[in-house]
Amino acid sequence: MLPTVFIVSDGTGITAETFAHSILSQFDQKFRLVRVPFVDSLDKAYATVEKINEAAVHDGRRAIVFTTLVDSESNDIVKRSNALVLDMFQRFVEPLEQELELKSSHAMGRGHQNADTEEYKTRIEAINFSLAHDDGQSNRNLSEADVILVGVSRSGKTPTSLYLAMQYGVKAANYPLIPEDFERGKLPSALAPYSEKLFGLSIDPQRLSEIRNERRPGSKYAAPENCRYEINEAEAMMRREGIKWLSSTHKSIEEIATTILQEIRLDRQSY
């Protein structure tokens, strides 16, 4: 039976879940994750304890709890559950308070609130921009892009663009490289004025064929030889044009996005 892991937060739980994934990935073990967001009252804290204790009885072992509860009373309630409780705020905030000689705000959901802030508006604008400029569907206002991802179809451009927008507020457009571009031997004319904003994504041809076969099985588009041709041509074009690029084959979206930010020297706040 898989160990049960609870992600308990008084907000969305995104911070706690990200941290939990980073820690749990160090163990060669699968886990059953239970998300419990918006625990913003004592009643909800007691209800959460009931869930945790029920899981412990069912599993025959203590649950594991990652918590970012700010309210000390709610936190104390959860800590009385039959679980190993890993309190991120107590572990990190209290030492920082001592080091900085400052008292933290102890405000619930502080990391994911205030829809009227400039940071939030910047992120929404970036998401809208990336959606409008997905897969080369619009050349309008390309000059506003922070980065333009290029690569063959299904090389990871769309998810990377959206991740950059949602996580960092980056206006990321993406543009497909197609056989017609390879025949001409040069980039699409729409991209010519923005060469300094281009970043390329490549992928292992065999992996590309597998991905494309899920979409259009048995087609020329998904054939291994066609995928090899497109990848070879795309990489050759990126080398000729001096475009920095990486292979997305064995990299997570997070790793790809971080590399892009470093390579194009974009200084962005993580949300």
From Swiss-Prot:
ADP binds at G151, V152, S153, R154, S155, G156, K157, T158. Keywords: Kinase, Nucleotide-binding, Serine/threonine-protein kinase, Transferase. Its EC number is 2.7.11.33, 2.7.4.28. It holds the Pfam family Kinase-PPPase. It catalyses: [pyruvate, water dikinase] + ADP = [pyruvate, water dikinase]-phosphate + AMP + H(+); [pyruvate, water dikinase]-phosphate + phosphate + H(+) = [pyruvate, water dikinase] + diphosphate. One of its GO terms (molecular function) is ATP binding. NCBIfam families: PRK05339.1. HAMAP family: PSRP. Bifunctional serine/threonine kinase and phosphorylase involved in the regulation of the phosphoenolpyruvate synthase (PEPS) by catalyzing its phosphorylation/dephosphorylation. Belongs to the pyruvate, phosphate/water dikinase regulatory protein family. PSRP subfamily. This is Putative phosphoenolpyruvate synthase regulatory protein.
